[in-house]
Amino acid sequence: MLAFLNQVRKPTLDLPLEVRRKMWFKPFMQSYLVVFIGYLTMYLIRKNFNIAQNDMISTYGLSMTQLGMIGLGFSITYGVGKTLVSYYADGKNTKQFLPFMLILSAICMLGFSASMGSGSVSLFLMIAFYALSGFFQSTGGSCSYSTITKWTPRRKRGTFLGFWNISHNLGGAGAAGVALFGANYLFDGHVIGMFIFPSIIALIVGFIGLRYGSDSPESYGLGKAEELFGEEISEEDKETESTDMTKWQIFVEYVLKNKVIWLLCFANIFLYVVRIGIDQWSTVYAFQELKLSKAVAIQGFTLFEAGALVGTLLWGWLSDLANGRRGLVACIALALIIATLGVYQHASNEYIYLASLFALGFLVFGPQLLIGVAAVGFVPKKAIGAADGIKGTFAYLIGDSFAKLGLGMIADGTPVFGLTGWAGTFAALDIAAIGCICLMAIVAVMEERKIRREKKIQQLTVA
């Protein structure tokens, strides 16, 4: 029934390596664009809820608590699905899996739209459909990581994944325009258009995405990426390919028993406290504590996203220049984050505030990308989805939740771990950044050992 999700592996074509390498580019770009545009589109049917909240309050009389319940449903299913759905996707055609999940998510959001009548809503159906949409979207990032990793050489992996990572920045930035266009021009200003129009776009993108590309050059008979680009197959891939390990055995051995993956999981929790803490509370801090105008506060939020866009592109490339030392590069960025948080906290005018938020966006999204890239370097390709998913689960269920609720309570004056007020909030951000540095430093050491070991193996092979 779902045969189109199965992997396709064709015998390697009897052609010279140079010819197969030239044939690689077109199917790679098709596959890359599918996961890039597909993941971007997922944000169009995710962030539209944030944009529509004020209209949902005025049109249907929903309370902040009710809106919070709807959002919480998405966060829980998204966090849980990061591991469950990504585990299922491993061993499947992950390029096909992403547009298929996009289609299912779009259908759910159409159901979400239908639960809003002309003058009344069904809160239960809204929570159910939005939660289901989150569950289906949860594997988008993991499928993208898996697909891109199978197509690209290790020495360029950070660059390709870094460029893909801007898809969510572009999707988040474009969500407002798409939602408002749907409401104002197609539904006479009614809030329901903010959900129906993006969902239709997502359906179209999803069905087109199913037609192009695949999850690996092996699907076209081109051989593995390592063979095409003259790289040694990783130790983890050699081990899983030379044995008849089941998917569960691979998951247990290379994910659950993998010390590096657990280090990255906890590092990701700390990083999400920093990232979401800044993202969630920057406008409130600027207005309440720094006494800046609401317009300047919003400008700072926008510059944080702009800095993230630039940083996402640059940090992956820098880690490639460092020969794949993702942990080391992440530690440098995290140290700079701590210094910049001090400037941001004590900003004496709007220009320092705006500059510090741009710098924080630039710096924070470096480690976020590099934690994911580091994870795929320590697992076989058959476990990339689950490895990326499990760190996402921890980040959303613990880091994201603490950043939104815990930091909010601290800023509001409620003591949490002895911290209170805005000074306590920034202390929590500093502690989280330091915790992330400590864990990433350990990862950097283990990464260095792995790089040197693989270099020695390659030298022996050449000799």
Swiss-Prot record:
InterPro entries: MFS, MFS_dom, MFS_trans_sf, OPA_Antiporter, Sugar-P_transporter_CS, Sugar_P_transporter. Residues 1-24, 82-96, 142-159, 211-259, 319-326, 379-391, 447-463 are cytoplasmic. It is a multi-pass membrane protein. Changing residue 143 to S: 30% of wild-type sugar phosphate transport activity. CDD domains: MFS_GlpT. One of its GO terms (molecular function) is glucose 6-phosphate:phosphate antiporter activity. The chain crosses the membrane at residues 25-45, 61-81, 97-117, 121-141, 160-180, 190-210, 260-280, 298-318, 327-347, 358-378, 392-411, 426-446. This is Hexose-6-phosphate:phosphate antiporter.
